[in-house]
Amino acid sequence: MRRQGPATLRGKAIPKTTTDQRLLDRRGPSDWVHADPWRVLRIQAEFVEGFGLLAELGPAVSVFGSARTARGTTEYERAERIGAGLASAGYAVITGGGPGIMEAANKGAVSANGVSVGLGIELPVEMGLNDYVEIGLEFRYFFVRKTVFIKYSQAFVVLPGGFGTLDELFEALTLVQTGKITRFPIVLVGSDYWSGLFSWIADALLGSGKIAAADPQLVRIADDPAEVVRIIVDAHRSGPLAGSG
């Protein structure tokens, strides 16, 4: 029998080398850096870096949407106006740091002399952080990145996007629905884009009893950037902000 930290190993489960040997023997294989215990340390390091970087950020709103949205389009300009409006209202603007909607929101924040944050993600196709990110961090793991989005945001603004945008939207909806975060406005921008999805939610999910009657009301849908900002400001005016740590 051998004790290995808090674990007990017996028989063939006992490794042929000690932890110190594997650390100090440079002739050993290098694939240990890809093992799960090492990944735990990398994951921990990402949390520490994210929490440390944004610990003193102050009130912030995350803006999500497609990386494929072209400059000069209505959606891009709307995201830029939302970013500027949020910054003028005293919020830092957090995005995924990429192009499209993310770039537009960061650009708007910078134009209004606000704080512009980008939380990037390692992808097979390198994108990098857009030029309007002033505070940036690149993550390896989606779930760490999503935790940082939630922890340092007081609201989510969601413009038209694809699977990644939907992932972030439903992550927030689940946390609000289950009471893990409170007083956390979720505003969808673009009634034409989102109305079909929420009609399906009302018909299929609510209609079959899979969600509560109040659950579809967890989100607001708006088209005007000024209204988006007003919804968030009004939601926070009467009490403490959710997601502030």
Report the location of each language-model feature.
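Active-site/ligand-binding-proximal alpha/beta "capping" segment
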Residues: R140-D192, H236-L241
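Acidic/glycine-enriched connector segments
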Residues: G100-V158
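Solvent-exposed alpha-helices and their adjacent loops that cap or buttress functional pockets
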Residues: L54-E56, G85-A87, A109-V110, M127-D131, ...
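Catalytic-core regions of core metabolic enzymes
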Residues: V33-V40, P185-I186, G190-Y193
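C-terminal functional extensions of proteins
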Residues: L188-G245
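Glycine-rich beta-alpha loop segments
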Residues: R2-D20, D25-L119
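Short gly/pro/ser/thr-enriched loop/turn and capping motifs at secondary-structure boundaries
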Residues: L123-G128, T165, Y193-G196
